[in-house]
């Protein structure tokens, strides 16, 4: 290996990558006998072909000659190739011939030459002389090659010529292999880095690099040729830093200046196609700093005035770039590696590293070998990163501290890899001094093998070494050897980490802790053991035996993972849990699945949960998905349905075991009891005649700092989160089915006495909330929040347990007893693959509508902090933004007048608020603004409908007005097909709807009017979102159906829903309103067969019959078989097909244009003065175009009147605020005012269509202006509605 490299530097010094022989004919003088004939052989071999054709041959024939495979089309090259091939074949056939090599080769060459020349060169004396000259040169080259052949290659019985040529070929290949660093550039000529480089002269390069070298006196620049490996340029500072003259570096190989152990690191880190290009955009303040941090390589460069005796190496940080440099004016530009070299000083010498910044990290294997070392360790320890890689960790520790590593690894195993602090250890620096460091350790547990894959260490220097220059070479001493104690400790640690981790800590690095046996462990953050003694306490758990593993597998396959999880994670007795707060990380603290605790236990449980919520999760999204995929595999096991039913009836919402079978049944729990909290929020009909207050705790302060706010985003599948594909997930995100009771800050305190009647909060500011378009930033932020929510909630996996017999006993419909335990949350992680019916119902007073744990406080809510990135929480229940559409609402007495208070911003993501504006407001009865709320004892009476604001309450639709069968979907995106696994629960034909406050449309049925509160509750429950998958799925259907009637949503796509903002639609019908109030019992299909534009001409004649048949159809599918059995036996009304019906685009657009033309009559008419005034403020009015905030293809909601705090400063929306159109809308204008919904028939309804359709005419833009104005002015409408009705 060394032979070719040595030869590369001697004997004329041919440069790799160039032509080996420049002259074409080597000197016939006495050859030099050297131990390495590599380059000389290459020169001679190259001469074999170069000399044959004169100047026509360039370096390509050298490779062909050396490989004996050159078949050139030219005659000269063909002859030379034939000569070599004939010589080779003749000598190989006569390999046993002992004839002298010279005579045999001469004979072969002459014969081959005569054979080749006879037919083609007769009569040409010039060609004959050329051939003779070529033959002579070839014989000379072969003779020289044979002289350079080592004696070991001259075997007996072998042809000398063949052996010589084979050895020459091997040497050429060896040289190419050793210089692969240079050959990479020629192989990567097609790479972009080779094409986009600028060419610099030496003067230009010196001028550019001086910008960096002059600012830092410890920096110099050097350019190394990729073709030769030699230095073509070096700055003046190099002589000062390396203590030698600058001329010493001229023409020297840069690799010769590096320390031998750093050469390979340098070559591996400076491959040309991996380097950034040095361009004009690189500046000293920006680009260089970034590349220095990411692309730097550490090497030691030799320096000193006399480099022969004991060379001294200085550590440098090299930042490589690739560029082209023209050495002289006539020379071609050659690619070079430009290096910015910065001298590394000890971190303890001036300029010192601040003590609080002396931190670095390491990673080592279970066998205690360094796997990765932070580059920040170089100035602190004196070692370059490559010095420690692969070295034993124990070798660098103080002998007295080495036993601590065994204790550290024991604690890592006990804590399942969770980070913890440990006592200081002493680490040996390069100069032989010891550095005292405070250490923190953590381990990565492999999600499948459950073993510690590697150990992470974070080290902070506490005490600097006595000799502050850590780069000083230590005194000569025998090389440190692995002592017997180091080997023994390494073996013990390795055997220890071979054991699988069985800790039950809920937040292990890979999330496997919750599946293990619940052993009480110390808190991961406990660092009370100053000397590591605590790690010796509880030894590592006994490994699971093979018999136990087989038993577990058998249990999972034949009896279900439900029973397996319960058998493996059976919780300890309750008193033990409350008595030992230290065992918090491994105990199951989910009060959702436990018996109702005693009142005196509430503060303790709340404190425990608060402490647990403060734990930092060290999981990563990909690690959690590894485990979740295993869980989903276990859930997919085919388990007998009888066993699964038994599990379903005895356990509610088990995160790690609820399978698809469980999603289809809720056991004996009645329909009214198994309400989803989300549907409860929307159930305004049952809440109106409430006569008993909800029993629950008071609200605790909102604390949103430790959990992503999007965890509680309500029905994210209706927002743009439905377009986000969760990695490794085939289920909807958890936030789709987790309501605001999952928020940590919403854990109620001690259960108080029955709360007084809810009070009304004042109306919010007109611009307190504003819909936001789907932007890249919002989408990215929401994705990050969803992933963070997924991580923060996955640690709750181990706190799940089955219900006790008391909590599993079915109760009367709508009646649940016992107070709400503190901290009640649905820990249905595993990415929402949970039963939608398994949401445990909220504890509430008998025969009362169940609500999430946050109950109306006696006083108004304080405004949330302004720093909250997302809205804080759903507004208090008695939020009477609008009066009932049914008619005049009698004002109840105001027993407790309340001072004005601002509404908190709703806890939903911006896009959820955009798509579901009505979801922001709960459903108790309607009351006017500014008045205290009292229970309404009578339902709203039928009367003519007053104009409705933009946030229209949901009210039942009369049976005579059919709805569109196209948008009956609970999902706005085909990416969430699994959201629609379970069809909606039965709905009565004229049943109540979970609508807005006091929602009613026309006279209610006599049975409903005379029903008791409990019966009314059952009706509300049956008409609610019974599947518990999406709290606002029916709301979305109503919005989409109204939009399908308005006919202006043809441009919207399915991912955002085609009815965004259609909630602003309203109309006045004497028989009942149909704009945004479609009864839930009128759903004909419950599934969407179409996600594109809305067919405005879709026939709706079959909707009434479908509404009548729906109750019987859906009842069959609520509490029975799993979804795949349902799909096999279901009829067309239940099946999800996603088949886009064939439609004529021209006809659809024509109908939409006709509707737009009819809606133009309802638009405001501006005079010329008004237009000038508007044009002075809004430029888009002058241009006759839509404003930028509205000129989007996606649907931008205009139905909400409360501004989003996160986008309150958006100039696009502030531009729309200035366009006040309230007088026009309230007055009705022509056609009754489209914005106010005062028109008759569908006119007012159409006027409220969403503005997602792109229109080009100025009249269409004026229509959108009026709609946006209606949105902004909507808060002023409700009071006027009451007065008018």
Curated annotation (Swiss-Prot):
Residues 853-867 have a biased composition (Pro residues). A motif (Nuclear export signal 2) lies at residues 489-498. Residues 1-151 are annotated as: Interaction with BTRC. Residues 1-134, 503-544, 643-694, 802-867, 931-1030, 1045-1091, 1202-1285 are annotated as: Disordered. Phosphorylated on serine residues by CSNK1D, CSNK1E and probably also by CSNK1G2. Phosphorylation by CSNK1D or CSNK1E promotes nuclear location of PER proteins as well as ubiquitination and subsequent degradation. May be dephosphorylated by PP1. Ubiquitinated; requires phosphorylation by CSNK1E and interaction with BTRC and FBXW11. Deubiquitinated by USP2. GO terms for molecular function: chromatin DNA binding; transcription cis-regulatory region binding; transcription corepressor binding. It comes from the Eukaryota. A motif (Nuclear localization signal) lies at residues 820-836. One of its GO terms (cellular component) is cytoplasm. Residues 823-840 have a biased composition (Basic residues). This is Period circadian protein homolog 1. It comes from Spalax judaei. The gene is PER1.
């Amino acid at each position: 290996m060394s032979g070719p490299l040595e030869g590369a530097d001697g004997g004329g010094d041919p440069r790799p990558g160039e032509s080996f022989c420049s002259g074409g004919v080597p000197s016939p003088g006495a050859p030099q006998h050297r131990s390495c004939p590599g380059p000389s052989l290459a020169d001679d071999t190259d001469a074999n072909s170069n000399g044959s054709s004169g100047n026509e041959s360039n370096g390509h024939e050298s490779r062909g000659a050396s490989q004996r495979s050159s078949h050139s089309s030219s005659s000269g090259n063909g002859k030379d190739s034939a000569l070599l091939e004939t010589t080779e074949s003749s000598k190989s056939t006569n390999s046993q011939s002992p004839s002298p090599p010279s005579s045999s080769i001469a004979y072969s060459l002459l014969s081959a030459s005569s054979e080749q020349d006879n037919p083609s060169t007769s009569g040409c004396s010039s060609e004959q002389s050329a051939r003779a000259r070529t033959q002579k040169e070839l014989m000379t080259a072969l003779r020289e090659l044979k002289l350079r052949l080592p004696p070991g290659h001259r075997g007996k019985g072998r042809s000398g010529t063949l052996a010589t040529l084979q050895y020459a070929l091997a040497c050429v290949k060896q040289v190419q292999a050793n210089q692969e660093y240079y050959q990479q550039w020629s192989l990567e000529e097609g790479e972009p880095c080779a094409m986009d480089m600028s060419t610099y002269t030496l003067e230009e390069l010196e001028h550019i690099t001086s910008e960096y070298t002059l600012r830092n006196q410890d920096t110099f620049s050097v350019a190394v040729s990729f073709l030769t490996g030699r230095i073509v340029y070096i700055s003046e500072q190099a002589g000062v830093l390396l203590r030698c003259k600058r001329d010493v570096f001229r023409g020297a190989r840069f690799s010769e200046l590096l320390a031998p152990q750093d050469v390979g690191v340098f070559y591996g880190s400076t491959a040309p196609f991996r380097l950034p290009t040095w361009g004009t955009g690189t500046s000293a303040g920006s680009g260089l700093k970034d590349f220095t941090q990411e692309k730097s390589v550490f090497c030691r460069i030799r320096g000193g005035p006399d480099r022969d005796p004991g060379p001294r190496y200085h550590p440098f940080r090299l930042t490589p770039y690739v560029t082209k440099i023209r050495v002289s004016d006539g020379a071609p530009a050659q690619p070079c590696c430009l290096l910015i070299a910065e001298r590394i000083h000890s971190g303890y010498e001036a300029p010192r590293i601040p003590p609080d910044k002396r931190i670095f990290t390491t990673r080592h294997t279970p066998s205690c070998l360094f796997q990765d070392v932070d580059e920040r360790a170089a100035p602190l320890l004196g070692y370059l990163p490559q010095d420690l890689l692969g070295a034993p960790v124990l070798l660098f520790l103080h002998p007295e501290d080495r036993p601590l590593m065994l204790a550290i690894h024991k604690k890592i195993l006990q804590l399942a890899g969770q980070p913890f602090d440990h006592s200081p250890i002493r680490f040996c620096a390069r100069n032989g001094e010891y550095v005292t460091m405070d250490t923190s350790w953590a381990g990565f547990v492999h999600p499948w093998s459950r073993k510690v894959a590697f150990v992470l260490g974070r080290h902070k220097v506490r005490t600097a070494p006595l000799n502050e220059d850590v780069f000083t070479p230590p005194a000569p001493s025998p090389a440190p050897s692995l002592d017997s104690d180091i080997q023994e400790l390494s073996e013990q640690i390795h055997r220890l980490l071979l054991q699988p981790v069985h800790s039950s800590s809920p937040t292990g690095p890979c999330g496997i802790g919750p599946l293990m046996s619940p052993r009480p462990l110390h808190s991961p953050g406990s660092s009370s053991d100053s000397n590591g003694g605590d790690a010796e306490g509880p030894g590592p758990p006994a490994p699971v035996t093979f018999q136990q593993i087989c038993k577990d597998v058998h249990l999972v396959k034949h009896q279900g993972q439900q029973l397996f999880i319960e058998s493996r994670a059976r919780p300890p007795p309750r008193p033990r849990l409350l008595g030992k707060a230290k065992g918090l990380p491994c105990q199951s603290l989910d009060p959702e699945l436990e018996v109702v605790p005693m009142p005196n236990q509430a503060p303790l449980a709340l404190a425990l949960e608060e402490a647990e919520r403060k734990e930092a999760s060290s999981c990563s999204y990909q690690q959690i998905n590894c485990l979740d995929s295993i869980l989903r595999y276990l859930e997919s096991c085919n388990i007998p349905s009888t066993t699964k039913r038994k599990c379903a009836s005895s356990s509610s919402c088990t995160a790690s075991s609820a399978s698809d079978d469980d999603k289809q049944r809720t056991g004996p729990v009645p329909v009214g009891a198994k309400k989803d909290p989300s549907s409860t929020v929307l159930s305004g009909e049952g809440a109106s005649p409430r006569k008993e207050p909800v029993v629950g705790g008071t609200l605790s302060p909102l604390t949103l700092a430790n959990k992503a706010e999007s965890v509680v985003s309500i029905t994210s599948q209706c927002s743009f989160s439905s377009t986000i594909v969760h990695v490794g997930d085939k289920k909807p995100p958890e936030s789709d089915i987790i309501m605001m009771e999952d928020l940590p800050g919403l854990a109620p305190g001690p259960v108080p006495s029955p709360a007084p009647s809810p009070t009304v909060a004042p109306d919010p500011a007109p611009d307190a909330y504003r819909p936001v378009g789907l932007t890249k930033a919002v989408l990215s932020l929401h994705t990050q929040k969803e992933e963070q929510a997924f991580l923060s909630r996955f640690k709750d996996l181990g706190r799940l347990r089955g219900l006790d017999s008391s909590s599993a006993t079915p109760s009367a419909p709508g009646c649940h007893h016992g107070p709400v335990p503190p901290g009640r949350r649905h820990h249905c992680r595993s990415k929402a693959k949970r039963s939608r019916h398994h949401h445990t119902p909220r504890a509430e007073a008998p025969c009362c509508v169940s609500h999430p744990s946050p109950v109306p406080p006696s006083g108004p809510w304080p405004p949330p902090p302004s720093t909250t990135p997302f809205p804080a929480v759903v507004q208090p229940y008695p939020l009477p933004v609008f009066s009932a559409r049914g008619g005049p609402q009698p004002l109840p007495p105001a027993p407790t007048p309340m001072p004005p208070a601002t509404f908190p911003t709703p806890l939903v993501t911006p896009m959820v608020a955009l798509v579901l504006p009505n979801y922001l407001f709960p459903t108790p009865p309607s009351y006017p603004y500014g008045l205290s709320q009292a229970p309404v004892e009578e339902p709203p009476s039928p009367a003519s409908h007053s104009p409705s604001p933009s946030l229209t309450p949901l009210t039942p639709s009369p049976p005579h007005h059919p709805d569109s069968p196209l948008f009956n979907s609970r999902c706005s995106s085909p990416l969430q097909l699994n959201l629609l696994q379970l069809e909606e629960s039965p709905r009565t034909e004229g049943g109540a709807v979970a609508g807005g406050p006091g929602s009613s449309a026309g006279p209610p049925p006599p049975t409903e009017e005379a029903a008791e509160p409990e019966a009314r509750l059952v009706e509300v429950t049956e008409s609610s979102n019974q599947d518990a998958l999406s709290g606002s799925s029916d709301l979305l259907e109503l919005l989409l159906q109204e939009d399908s009637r308005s006919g202006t949503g043809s441009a919207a796509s399915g991912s955002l829903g085609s009815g965004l903002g259609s909630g602003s639609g309203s109309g006045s019908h004497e028989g009942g309103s149909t704009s945004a109030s479609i009864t839930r019992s009128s759903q004909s299909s419950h599934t969407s067969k179409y996600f594109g534009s809305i067919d405005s001409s879709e026939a709706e004649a079959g909707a009434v019959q479908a509404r009548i048949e729906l109750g019987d159809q859906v009842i069959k599918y609520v509490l029975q078989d799993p979804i795949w059995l349902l799909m096999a036996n279901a009829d067309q009304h239940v099946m999800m097909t996603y088949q886009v019906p064939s439609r004529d685009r021209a006809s659809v657009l024509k109908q939409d244009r006709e509707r737009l033309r009819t809606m133009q009559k309802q638009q405001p008419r501006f005079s010329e003065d008004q237009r000038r005034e508007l044009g002075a403020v809004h430029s888009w009015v002058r241009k006759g175009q839509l404003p930028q905030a509205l000129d989007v293809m996606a649907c931008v909601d205009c139905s909400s009147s409360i501004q989003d705090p996160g986008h309150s400063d958006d100039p696009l929306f502030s531009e729309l605020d200035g366009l006040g159109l309230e007088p026009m809308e309230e007055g009705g204008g022509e056609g009754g005012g489209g914005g106010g919904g005062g028109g008759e028939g569908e006119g007012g309804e159409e006027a409220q269509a969403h503005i997602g359709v792109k229109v080009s005419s100025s009249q269409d833009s004026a229509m959108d202006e009026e709609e946006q104005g209606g949105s902004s002015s909507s808060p002023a409408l409700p009071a006027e509605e009451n007065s008018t009705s």
